[in-house]
């Protein structure tokens, strides 16, 4: 595929995973990660595509020379969200506002008894009263579970690959842009049908219960640039168990991004 773009671009795209990454053994410094990096080019233009984890740890840096070389060669960077939106203090408030239930019902009334019990158990393990989730939509609670699991194991969004390259682009004076707006990204989650939202919270609980071995495997696959390992350990399960949710989060968003990349 030839992309007609006037500039060499680096696209930093996140891997959608409701999984956490373990802190590595610090006794031996690991080799620099070689994440998912592709180059698409013709005689005039080039696009680098880089797969990202949104939360990382200090041991994941520095990146491999190939990634740093792609950044140096790129004249502009594109992210899922533009830096001014992703790093805006208004972003969490926008998400919180969208997540509030407005029909007078509670989350407990919406979830089946088995899922509520699982949520109650997870909340208890993390020192949270489960009733604190009652005023929110399932998608927001599922996202909260994923983020808590990540940060509980030492991950830091400030160290995520997106923020890393946003900061580097700003320091280097390179233009940046987003493939979608914050409202669009929130709308993907908030616009899910009730069945999809309940699946989202179950998927988050499933990942939380799989524990450290699964998340370490995914992290190592990312560090190796192992696309097949990430697919089989993450996307394939979602596609098989929750096909409509998979289509909404992965397929439809990717389809919407392609014309913006080609511009």
Which residues does each predicted region cover?
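Generic detector of isolated residues embedded in canonical secondary-structure elements
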Residues: 20-22, 168, 260
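Bacterial N-terminal signal peptides
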Residues: 6-20
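N-terminal secretory signal peptides that target proteins for export/translocation
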Residues: 1-5
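Alpha-helical scaffolding within the catalytic cores
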Residues: 32-35, 257-259
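Boundary at the C-terminal end of the N-terminal hydrophobic targeting segment
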Residues: 21-25, 31
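A cross-kingdom marker for long, charged
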Residues: 244-263
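Structured, acidic catalytic/metal-binding patches in enzyme active sites
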Residues: 34-249
